[in-house]
């Protein structure tokens, strides 16, 4: 490589574990690999979007960066790039009224696709066993996330949750509901609250992950498949 020391001044390095993702478990029912938070949700969301034909509502899949440090910067969800794109689309209509941009955002439905913490028997005290995610039970929904209760979280309303449930039930998609660990012990943040600030209906959904943020994370193949099916059903049938 024709590289000099000064090139590192403007380099952007992405250093990750060298091992490839592989089967895990005696029955090979799981996947082990680095960065499944949140590649596993990006993968399922993108494929669901690409394979959805002629949805009744205008649909999109947004892949954003910097969630772990507050969704800041030009590529984080706090950036106004999505709002700008909606405005650009509205400007192409006969009436480019800025008020319609806000109405379009407010009338939108969103699944905030992010992983959830799978129950870990080695750290059972960190979970509420009757309200946590388990492997093999399907797509996970979190009514709220945050930490210390609902701090810095979105709180999905009951009517929207019922609407999403109906879509999944009609398409026979396996799903479960969960918290992100016990109150005052667990917790985690997503981008859901940012989009909810527009008034749109948002709920967190994703795949349960074991050993989240470890060099190698573990997910269930069945859950990955149900996430893909659930996202596709949402794009096709949400009204």
Residue ranges of model-derived segments:
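Flexible, glycine/charged-enriched surface loops at secondary-structure junctions
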Residues: 2-12, 55-61, 95-107, 168-182, ...
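Active-site-adjacent substrate-binding region
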Residues: 6, 116-123, 127-214
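Acidic, glycine-rich active-site loops and adjacent beta-strand->loop/helix elements
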Residues: 19-21, 63-71, 76, 115-117, ...
